[in-house]
Amino acid sequence: IAWRRWLHQHPEISFEEFETTAFILERLKAFGGFEISRPAKTGVVAALDTKKPGRTIALRADIDALPIREDNALPYKSMRDGVMHACGHDGHTAILLGTACTLSKISEDLAGRILLIFQHAEEQPPGGAIELYKAGVMEGVDEIYGLHLSSAYPSGVFGIRPGVLTAAT
């Protein structure tokens, strides 16, 4: 929760996620076990290679915020006037960081390669995904999974289905 709240207080718009990137890097380095790369000026890709045969699975979270003013009295509201995490990317990033922490602890029990993609600039066309693709991030990936927070479900419940869900591109 502390990670999510810090991220919520420090939102950054697409292609300007410098503090967010530094925050992610600091935690990934502390967890250990990841090969970390920066294929673009913001965003992070962390690879966990178990050295055992298996598939390459990618997990992706978006890290950018929106140019919207947050108008509430939450103790962790945005500290940047006119910019906020209105779409849940602070939660997505915190969830992927939590996943990274857990994976680093159980890596000996895993097989294959796991790629954690902290994608910059999801909200602003042409989007950071294109830069990552052109940099070769998706080469060798067998499957990729993402998530999106939704107020349509009560806390503790998640929705899942085969195929594409909530994808705009």
Model-based region annotation:
Residues V45, L66-I68, A73-M84, G91, ...:
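Histidine/acidic-residue-rich, glycine-tolerant segments that coordinate divalent metal ions
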